Amino acid sequence: MRLSLIQLTVGSDFNDNFEKSKDLIQDALSYNPELILFPECFLYLSNSKKYSIDQNHESIIYFQNFAKKNNVNILLGSLPISDNKSVYNRSLVVDSNGSIISKYDKIHMFDVILRNNEIYKESDTFKSGNKLETFDINGWKFGHSICYDL
């Protein structure tokens, strides 16, 4: 299977990150991939629940339309998705028909005390998932994993 992996430096501006992602996914098509993969928190990295989106957000719809138009599968590494009760660090898989075929909520949050005693706790923002997920693309089986879940 031919894959395209996208890596980008995520800034604090959601719209800027979204525009960069749209440019990079367009560039990735030149490699004729069956699956394009984005990293964790590729549209926004924040420890604030106020920046979460729902699963019908325009950015997700954009990638669904892109997948269908270009007959390509996309793994949206992770996004801060809210279900009105909680916010999850969620990975979504969009198939070449533009349908979300799999979702996975990060299970193991990254909580750490840094050398300078600065504390970073994902668990203050995100609710942990509780289920492992797999998905199939073109006869290949994949498993989701986000960062600390490995």
Question: What do the predicted segments below correspond to?
Answer:
Residues 6-7, 45:
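A short, mixed-charge helix-start or loop-turn motif at secondary-structure junctions
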Residues 14, 25-97, 103:
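Cys-nucleophile CN-hydrolase/nitrilase-fold catalytic domain and related Cys-dependent amidase chemistry
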Residues 17:
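Substrate/cofactor-recognition hotspot
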